[in-house]
Amino acid sequence: MNRLFLSVSVALSATTCSFAQQITQPNLVLFIADDCSYYDLGCYGSVDSKTPNIDNFATQGVRFTQAYQAAPMSSPTRHNLYTGLWPVGSGAYPNHTCADQGTLSVVHHLHPLGYKVALIGKKHVAPKSVFPFDLYVPSEKGELHFISYSEIYR
């Protein structure tokens, strides 16, 4: 009886492990737009803006209804979003400044989970050690490099 129980337990464990390996992780996609509010997107009820692709995308994922930004400027807000820290806490305040060396970003937390992290478009975060994106595709403006004021005056 004990051998039968052990055999069944081992077989079930192996089956469970093989099923666990087949589970795929969800894709995480975050849209960030400067000067955009819920009045600007159809998925939030705008009748003036036609955003069918974003609206369709929103039906397949999570839509936030209680979100607030940490700063009224682009760079500190992006640093806050990517690090989870208030801009002052990461060293990224005021605008066009760098996060402190050693600050962990979403990239550092997602890599151990097997994710590849890309940034497409406007960057406005630095230094690269804090934001080591696997892929960066600059916007049409060619923002390949972001040089902060704090880097210039160090």
Task: Briefly describe each language-model feature range.
Residues 7-15:
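Bacterial N-terminal signal peptides
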